[in-house]
UniProtKB/Swiss-Prot annotation:
The modification N6-carboxylysine is found at residue 490. SUPFAM superfamilies: Composite domain of metallo-dependent hydrolases (SSF51338), Metallo-dependent hydrolases (SSF51556), Urease, beta-subunit (SSF51278), Urease, gamma-subunit (SSF54111). The gene is JBURE-II. Ni(2+) 2 binds at residues 490, 519, 545. Urea hydrolase involved in recycling metabolically derived urea generated internally or externally. Is able to impair growth of the phytopathogenic fungus Penicillium herguei, and shows entomotoxic activity by inhibiting diuresis in Malpighian tubules isolated from Rhodnius prolixus. It comes from Canavalia ensiformis (Jack bean). The lineage of its organism: Eukaryota, Viridiplantae, Streptophyta, Embryophyta, Tracheophyta. This is Urease 2.
């Protein structure tokens, strides 16, 4: 066929579109991805017919689907579709704005070329149901004053040129086009008093009166036409006016120009204020505004905003971050940021704030106000945007710390793509590939295997940690795997999780300051849960899948969540309890643990692990902070790409069931949001001794960041930043004239190629391995760091998830009682972050 790469990409788009047509033909309302695929692929088909113009194709795209043919969230998720098609006169971009604009679509046209039957409109429900708007911004009432407390002046301006002139908000007004005539002396040190990034356009012959305000910061003028270069003072003003006259720039004195100071008083003529909704549309929500997270019922309210209204650093044509304006001149690379993320909403366990994020040398250098200190107030000293600074526009977007999955079976390397594309940037676990041992346990047993796993993942843009096998009652072998690079040890019943093995493993871990992860004895062979707790002997331990469906003492392993020395986590297939949770688990367990349905004892072993009552209790324990971490158990009773989505599904279910979580009121869910994000960011970092490097959006940590559209939050990120560089991102047609035409896929970027993956990431090992020089011995390019400060941890050290409830479990009914109250939680039939977003 001699196909080009772009043709192969369009075939995948066609396949998705045809799948959507089949679903539409049988009366299924389409989700976001299906709607995009159907409309884009139909445009390509009509283009191939060769009879339609670009304008006609745009029109067709607006009439294929209506609100009744798509899920209720889709009209809010889908506001534009772009695709590049080969027409008889070459490749052209077709853009469809607001493609879901009518009550019903033209279904015959939507199924054109498919030869599928056209369904009756009666098959599609009326679209009158109440529904949430995914990612909606809920603005507080009122207006925001721009540039308060500044000297201001109104000046008359005339365009004597024969072409239009457009002037941006932060352009030094004295420096503008010579064909604009006005009092340039009074404009010295001034700029337009308009919203940052806006502009004023002067058509030929236009007469306009403009409101100017003084520049801020150090008041140093750079750039423009080099009329007034230097600090704002009387001597430089006089020199600038001499240049104005000599170079014949338009100048006319306006002696009676109105001058004053901007205030917060709406009646002050110099005051510029804009409605909060308009502000949010330009720069994202500010303090007091709220965001819905994805299609959940979780509402985040902005607690703090570092922006100075009117001085936001905005990138784009005619915007703020340009030479001498928002971008400084004269600050070399050492003094300026490598990258700035502008005006992002940060959701972290530390708070929900609006700020610029500065990145330098792969680290989070600063969080606050970025820009040009020569003309802007409040720019942080280490947040200078210079000539050597790259920009990622964060307006209207959410930034979180890269997720940490601390229960990973390294069964296949392809799972790592699923991890990073979902927002996971650090993985901890064990395995050697698709061996039976690795399918069941997170252990990398042999020193040679530890070396190989560190080497084989060296170029992958993720932070890695590998755990050795801890199931041994003699210390020597454990010391050897730790020296080979194990950053932790794993006790697992499939290898033996006896009191003797537990005691020995913890004793060795104490010597090396590494964590011990445990999957306890489901069948109670050596004792009950109380005997295992006794073997802990007060020592710190991380209990995997602490509810028990993933493994552990039946039926009451969940009682470990009462213990101060136990750091409990969950795996995501039980997060949260749904009407299908119990039914799917039995076969998972049979496969993972080499069990045989024909052996009654094997069947009983698996069945004993799956208890709806304890899974229901697990939901509530997460909500009260009794379980501290959510992880995956990747490909071994867990899904590596769904750690984040399952966390937010659990939070949403608990809000619906239990109402606001103290200290939240009825207006926001900030405390619950911070509690739940801690479960896959800071808490797994603390437990594994790596929190000084990763786990939160805090200064000094690795710039592992995830950028989300609010409407897709928790389901599909836009950009994953690894060590300060973009590793994965939503990207459209690689042959496209712009980066947004379909098919838009989550794709690896330059941060994954060549030596970048190792340069941007860390391999975590034991201090013993670091001291032995495994980086050089193994030829690793990754930065290698030792884990630390884990052996003294208690649950009280974990963030926002450190409650110590008293838990009992009835051995007959499996009813879980917490602090004297029996727990119950409904098995739900629907969850957010599911069918609105995913084709399969």
């Amino acid at each position: 066929m001699k196909l080009s790469p772009r043709e192969v990409e369009k075939i995948s788009l066609h396949n998705a579109g045809f799948l959507a047509q089949k679903r539409l033909a049988r009366g299924v309302r389409l989700n976001y991805s299906e709607s995009v695929a159907l409309i884009a692929s139909q445009i390509l088909e009509h283009a191939r017919d060769g009879e339609k113009t670009v304008a006609q194709l745009m029109s067709i795209g607006k009439h294929l689907l209506g609100r009744r043919q798509v899920l209720p969230a889709v009209p809010h998720l889908l506001n534009i579709i772009q695709v590049e098609a080969t027409l008889p006169n070459g490749t052209k971009l077709v853009t469809v704005h607001d493609p879901i604009a009518n009550e019903n679509g033209d279904l015959e046209e939507a199924l054109y070329g498919s030869f599928l039957p056209v369904p009756s409109l009666d098959k599609f429900a009326e679209s009158k149901e109440e529904h949430k708007i995914p990612g909606e911004i809920i603005c507080a009432d009122g207006r925001l004053t721009l540039n308060p407390g500044r000297k201001a002046v109104f000046l008359k301006v005339v365009n004597h040129g024969d072409r239009p002139i457009q002037v941006g908000s932060h352009y030094h007004f004295i420096e503008v086009n010579p064909y604009l005539t006005f009092d340039r002396r009074k404009a010295y040190g001034m700029r337009l008093n308009i919203a940052a990034g806006d502009s004023v356009r002067f058509e030929p012959g236009d007469h306009k009166t403009v409101n100017l305000v003084s520049i801020g910061g150090n008041k140093i003028i750079r750039g423009g036409n080099a009329i007034a270069d230097g600090p704002v003072n009387e001597a430089n003003c006089k020199a600038a006016m001499e240049i104005v006259c000599r170079r014949e720039f338009g100048h006319k004195e306006e002696e009676d120009a109105s001058e004053g100071v901007t205030t917060g008083d709406p009646d002050c003529p110099f005051t510029k204020a804009i409605p909060r909704e308009e502000y949010a549309n330009k720069y994202g929500p500010t303090i007091g505004d709220k965001i819905r997270l994805g299609d959940t019922d979780l509402i985040a309210e902005i607690e703090k905003d570092f922006a100075l209204y009117g001085d936001e650093s905005v990138f784009g044509g005619g915007k703020v971050i340009r030479d001498g304006m928002g971008q400084s001149s004269g600050h070399p690379p050492a003094m300026s940021l490598d990258t700035v993320i502008t005006s992002a909403v940060i959701i972290d366990y530390t708070g929900i704030i609006k700020a610029d994020i500065g990145i330098k040398d792969g680290l989070i250098a600063s969080i606050g106000k970025a820009g040009n200190p020569d003309i802007m107030n409040g720019v942080f000293p280490n947040m200078i945007i210079g000539v050597n600074t790259e920009v990622i526009c964060g307006e209207g977007l959410i930034v979180t710390a890269g997720g940490i999955d601390c229960h990973v079976h390294y069964i296949c390397p392809q799972s790592l793509d699923e991890a990073i594309s979902s927002g996971i940037t650090t993985v901890v676990g064990g395995g050697t590939g698709p061996t039976d041992g690795s399918r069941a346990t997170t252990c990398t047993p042999a020193p040679t295997q530890m070396k190989l796993m560190l080497q084989s993942t060296d170029d992958i843009p993720l932070n890695f940690g590998f755990t050795g096998k801890g199931s041994g009652s003699h210390p020597d072998e454990l010391h050897e795997i730790i020296k080979a690079g194990a950053m932790g040890l794993k006790l697992h019943e499939d290898w033996g999780c006896t009191p003797a093995a537990i005691d020995n493993c913890l004793a060795v871990a104490e010597q090396h300051d590494i964590q011990v992860n445990i999957h306890t004895d489901t069948v109670n062979e050596s004792g009950f849960v109380e005997h295992t707790i006794a073997a802990f002997n007060g020592r710190t331990i991380h209990t995997y899948h602490s509810e028990g469906a993933g493994g552990g003492h039946a039926p009451d392993i969940i009682k470990v969540c009462s213990m101060k020395n136990v750091l409990p986590s969950s795996t995501n297939t039980t997060r949260p309890l749904t009407s299908n949770t119990v039914d799917e688990h039995l076969d998972m367990l049979m496969v993972c643990h080499k069990l045989n349905r024909e052996i009654p004892e094997d069947l009983a072993f698996a069945s004993s692990r799956v208890r709806e009552q304890t899974i229901a209790a697990e939901d509530i324990l997460h909500d009260i902070g009794g379980i501290s971490i959510i992880s995956s158990d990747a490909q071994a009773v867990g899904r590596i790409g769904e750690v984040i989505s399952c966390t937010w599904q659990t939070a949403d279910k608990m809000k619906a069931e239990r109402g606001p979580l103290q200290p939240d009121g009825s207006d926001n869910d900030n405390f619950r949001i911070k509690r739940y994000i801690a479960k896959y960011t800071i808490n797994p970092a603390i437990v594994n001794g790596i929190s000084q490097y990763v786990g939160s959006v805090e200064v000094g940590k690795l710039a592992d960041l995830v950028i989300w559209k609010p409407s897709f939050f928790g389901a599909k990120p836009d950009i994953v930043i690894k060590g300060g560089s973009i590793a994965w991102a939503d990207m459209g047609d690689p042959n496209g004239s712009i980066p947004t035409p379909e098919p838009v896929l989550m794709r690896p970027m330059y941060g994954t190629l060549g030596k970048a993956g190792s340069a941007l990431s860390i391999a975590f090992v034991s201090k013993a391995a670091l001291d032995l020089g495994v980086k050089v011995l193994y030829g690793l390019n990754k930065r290698v760091e030792a884990v630390s400060n884990v052996r003294k941890l208690t649950k009280l050290d974990l963030k926002l998830n450190n409650s110590l409830p008293e838990i009992t479990v009835c051995p007959e009914t499996f009813t879980v009682t917490v602090d004297g109250q029996a727990l119950s939680s409904e098995a739900v039939t629907t969850l957010p972050l599911s069918q609105n977003y995913f084709i399969f």
